[in-house]
A protein has these predicted regions:
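Conserved thiamine diphosphate
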Residues: 116-169
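Glycine-/acidic-rich phosphate or pyrophosphate-binding loops and their flanking alpha/beta elements
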Residues: 7-11, 232-254, 267
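Conformationally flexible catalytic loops at phosphate/diphosphate-handling active centers
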Residues: 161-246
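Peripheral docking tails and interdomain loops at the edges
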Residues: 312-359
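Thiamine diphosphate
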Residues: 1-127, 134, 142, 338, ...
Length: 359
């Protein structure tokens, strides 16, 4: 299949369309504005719906409603905009409504800046809206990987009835890369496969079988039963949907943990360190929830590994999960920046060299 040079944000939008998304609700915010811009042109071409909402709060609640009919729905925003969506995201999770949410992370906290960041890891993986819920959360490291993950995102969302979150730093959205676009999925809502969906009532239907999309349970026992069902589903996701990349880990003296674009920079550092005679590996979570604890532990706790370096474009958020995975078996160091200052290859090389010298 031929390669096409595409900007990340536009490629992500096109992949969603090819995966069957026919409803986009969003609001412009840098650095993801090209996603709604692209959708505004493409959705009418394929008979879909593009709606620029009056706010992020309105957009996520439109997602809630449209996804409740069984349609494949998507919204996108960036850090402070995603913060505004958190109430609606919790509603979608509580009602078990499948949808795809894109967060093109930018610098923070507050309004921060419009450059790339990985500062929303806690929000996407640990926090967000209220209640005990999770989102299946992907952290792509390239435009092609974002496309490939999008092509499975709706299938996963519908299998488990869980919203899917993409944590894509601003560089992924703004860079251009040659990509291979998949064929268009012929998706139609099948009420037999989605008995929970509100697909409308017609004369002759059994009123007792009406669809109700709901996240409120006034009765305590009913809420407890619902939460037990959610937790059972999350355990199934943890058991089946962990994704990661292990790179050059066999025989490594040091292991780097990183996600997203930072992991690509780490690979450049690994190549330079190899020229200096130092064997360094990389473990990159592709799903940051569920986090691949066992895979990280296996790579980092090899007998020959002297220490682990976690590198992030924040002040050390995934670091907590890395430490939980390793559980004190190896020393874990951290290197990172916030304020959208991307860690460089030279900085990572220098950090590994200082660790080797015992500094």
């Amino acid at each position: 299949m031929a390669l096409t040079l595409m900007k990340g944000s536009e490629a992500i939008a096109e992949a969603a369309i090819r995966a069957g998304a026919r409803f986009f609700f969003g609001y412009h915010i840098t650095p993801q504005t090209e996603i709604p811009e692209y959708m505004s042109a493409r959705m009418p071409e394929i008979g879909g719906c593009f709606l620029q909402a009056e706010s992020e709060v309105a957009a996520i609640n439109m997602v809630y409603g449209a996804a409740g009919t069984g349609a494949r729905v998507i919204t996108s925003s960036s850090s402070p905009g995603v913060s505004l969506k958190q109430e609606g995201i919790s509603y979608c999770a509580g009602a078990m409504v499948p949808a795809v949410i894109i967060n093109v992370m930018r610098g923070g906290p507050g309004l921060g800046n419009i450059q790339a960041s990985q500062g929303d890891y806690f929000q996407g993986v640990k926090g967000g809206g209220n209640g005990d819920y999770h989102l299946l959360t992907f952290a792509p490291a390239s435009v092609q990987e974002a496309i490939d993950l999008m092509m499975i995102a709706y299938d996963k969302a519908e299998k488990y009835r869980i919203p899917v979150l993409f944590l894509a730093d601003g560089i992924i959205a703004q860079m251009m890369e040659p990509v291979e676009l998949p064929e268009m999925v012929d998706y139609k809502v099948d009420p037999e496969k989605k008995p929970w969906a509100c697909t409308g009532w017609k004369p002759g239907d059994d009123p007792a079988k009406r669809g109700i999309i709901n996240s409120i349970y006034i009765d305590t026992e009913s809420l407890a039963v619902h939460n037990d069902e959610l937790q059972a589903m999350y355990k199934e996701v943890v058991a089946n949907e962990q994704m990661w990349e292990s790179y050059n880990c066999e025989g490594a003296e040091y292991i780097i943990t990183a996600f997203g674009t930072v992991a690509r920079i780490a690979k450049s550092a690994i190549a330079e360190l190899k020229e200096k005679g130092i064997n360094v590996g990389l473990v990159r979570p592709i799903t940051v929830w569920p986090f691949p604890y066992d895979a990280v532990r296996e790579a980092c706790c090899q007998p020959g590994v002297k220490a682990v370096l976690d590198v992030e474009l924040n002040e050390g958020q995934m670091l907590e999960d890395v430490k939980l995975a390793i559980n004190g078996a190896k020393h874990v160091d951290f290197f990172g920046h916030c304020g959208s200052q991307m860690p460089s290859t030279d900085e990572i090389v220098t950090k590994i060299l200082s660790m080797k010298e015992g500094k």
